[in-house]
C-alpha cells in the first residue's frame, strides 16, 4: 500500500436499509476508470455508523463482487464493539478484501494505554492486515504518535490514515514511524493531500474523488513527481470544490449532503442520506448545481 493513492467512495442508499446496487456499480466503475489505486468502504463518507450490520455486510459483499479483484479493497471495521469489528473483518476476508481499517472505539473515550491495549487485543484476532485510522473529530480520541509506534510493532499493522487535518501531527507520526519503510502514511482531508505527499506521505483517501477521480489522481501523481506547476494548477480546483460543494448549509452534515447531492446531479447515484440526516431541498440542490457548473471540467448535469 505504500505507493498507492487510495480514494474513498460513498455507500449508496435508496432508504435507511436498502443498498443502491446500480448506483454502487456506476460509482465503482467511475472510480476504476478514473485511475484510483484502491477502494475504501464503510468509513466516514460511507456513513457506516448510521447503518445496520446487515447492510454493512451487504456493502462489503457487493463491493468485492463488482470490483472483482481489480483494485485493493479496504474495509473499515470501526465500532464500539470489538466483537463486531472482528466479525466485519472476517466478512471482508471471506469476500476478498485486502485489508481492514479501524478508528478507535468511540463514546467511552479510552486513554492512550487503553487504546494500545485495545489494538493489541484486536489485531491478533483479525484475518487481514490493518490500517489505523485517526478521526478525532468523530471519535473524540487522538492516537498519540508513541501509541501508533507501539501498536505498529506488530507487522500486521501496515499503515495509518489521518483525518485530523493537522499537518504537524501527520509529520510527527511520519517521524516516529520512519524506521518502518513498509508503513503507509495516508491522509484523509483532500485539501492537504498534495502537501502531505510532497513531505513524504504515500497518498490520500479523498471523498472528492467520488465526483472527479481524475482530478485527485492527477494531483497525487503530480505531488509524487514533484511537478509543482501541475500541483499549483490542480490544488485550487480541489479548494474550489471544498469551499463550495462541502459548505452549503453550514451544518455538520454539509459535507455528506453536498457530496451526495453532487453525485446525484452527475448521474452516479441517489442522494439519499441515512438518518438522522436528510437530502438537500431544492434551494440547496441548486447551489450545488451552480457550484458544479462553475468547475472548468463539469459535464452535463441531471435535473
Predicted regions, residues:
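Single conserved hydrophobic/aromatic residue that forms the stacking wall/gate
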Residues: 1-5, 9
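A general structural signal for well-ordered alpha-helical segments in protein cores
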Residues: 24, 56, 60, 85, ...
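Active-site beta->alpha loop and helix N-cap motifs at the rims of alpha/beta catalytic domains
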Residues: 13-142
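Structural preference for beta-strand elements that scaffold enzyme active sites
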Residues: 6-7, 37-38, 72-74, 98-101, ...
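Active-site-adjacent beta-strand anchor residues
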Residues: 75-78, 163, 186-187, 206, ...
Amino acid at each position: 500500500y505504500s505507493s498507492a493513492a487510495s480514494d474513498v467512495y460513498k455507500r449508496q442508499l435508496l432508504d435507511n436499509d436498502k443498498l443502491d446496487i446500480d448506483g454502487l456499480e456506476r460509482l465503482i466503475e467511475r472510480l476504476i476508470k478514473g485511475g484510483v489505486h484502491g477502494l475504501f468502504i464503510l468509513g466516514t463518507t460511507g456513513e457506516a455508523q448510521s447503518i445496520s450490520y446487515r447492510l454493512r455486510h451487504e456493502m462489503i459483499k457487493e463491493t468485492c463482487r463488482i470490483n472483482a479483484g481489480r483494485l485493493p479493497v479496504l474495509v473499515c471495521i470501526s465500532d464500539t464493539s470489538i466483537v463486531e469489528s472482528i466479525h466485519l473483518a472476517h466478512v471482508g476476508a471471506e469476500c476478498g478484501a485486502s485489508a481492514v481499517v479501524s478508528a478507535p472505539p468511540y463514546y467511552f473515550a479510552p486513554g492512550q494505554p487503553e487504546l494500545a491495549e485495545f489494538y493489541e487485543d484486536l489485531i491478533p484476532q483479525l484475518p487481514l492486515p490493518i490500517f489505523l485510522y485517526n478521526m478525532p473529530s468523530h471519535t473524540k480520541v487522538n492516537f498519540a504518535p508513541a501509541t501508533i509506534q507501539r501498536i505498529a510493532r506488530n507487522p500486521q499493522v501496515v499503515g495509518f490514515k489521518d483525518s485530523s487535518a493537522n499537518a504537524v501531527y501527520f509529520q510527527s507520526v511520519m517521524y516516529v514511524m520512519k524506521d518502518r519503510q513498509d508503513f503507509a502514511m495516508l491522509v484523509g482531508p483532500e485539501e492537504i493531500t498534495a502537501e502531505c505527499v510532497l513531505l513524504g506521505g504515500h497518498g490520500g483517501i479523498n471523498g472528492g474523488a467520488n465526483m472527479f477521480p481524475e482530478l485527485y489522481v492527477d494531483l497525487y501523481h503530480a505531488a509524487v513527481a514533484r511537478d509543482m506547476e501541475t500541483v499549483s494548477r490542480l490544488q485550487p480546483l480541489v479548494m474550489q470544490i471544498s469551499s463550495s460543494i462541502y459548505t452549503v448549509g453550514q451544518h455538520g452534515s454539509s459535507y455528506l449532503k453536498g457530496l451526495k447531492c453532487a453525485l446525484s446531479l452527475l448521474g452516479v447515484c441517489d442522494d439519499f442520506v441515512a438518518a438522522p440526516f436528510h437530502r438537500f431541498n431544492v434551494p440547496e440542490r441548486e447551489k450545488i448545481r451552480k457550484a458544479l457548473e462553475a468547475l472548468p471540467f463539469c459535464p452535463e448535469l441531471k435535473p
